[in-house]
Amino acid sequence: PAGDEVVLIYEVTGKVVRPGGLPIESGVAVFNVETIYNVWRAMNQQTPVVDKLVSVVAEVEHPVTVRVPIGTTIEEVVALAGGTTVKDPVYFIGGPMMGFIGSGSQPVTKTTNAVLVLPQDHYLVKRKRSKSSIDMKRAAACCCQCSMCTDLCPRHLLGHPIQPHLFMRAATCKDVQQPNIFINTFFCCSCGVCELYSC
């Protein structure tokens, strides 16, 4: 994921943030462009953060990135993109990997950056609505321990001790002999590579 600061730090500087560590411990601070702009406005124009850049894409008339006041509803933001092109849309707040399903009455907050307008039957909507208990049963039935999920895990690739395939084996078999397998899942960045792309 391009927005994962731990991966970004490695790609730009070659430094690896230790598992569970903070970027500043590696002598690095990561800010996005909008944050830097907001700091500049606060310091030079004495303007607090009262608006947000939001991209509205997918099933809309005119995909657009707009600056809207914080507190604007998602439906109002989607209207600025010409409205939806599907009946009964699902508003997916954030990106496809780490986003969540929101509602039209939900307000834009300081962390809102994108709205994906999707149909009810879209794969991302189905994935977010699925129950974790069903996901675990499905994984237990089909996981062949190929370790592709671990091979593609961005945190594992940086040397962090997370191994999704071993977690799946331990979780589905209810094997608690090696507690570190479970503890190491705290280093997961929730990007979804293991479940959405590798498996």
Report residues per predicted region.
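Hydrophobic alpha-helical positions that pack around
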Residues: 1-74, 80-87, 95
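Structured core elements
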Residues: 55, 65-67, 76, 92, ...
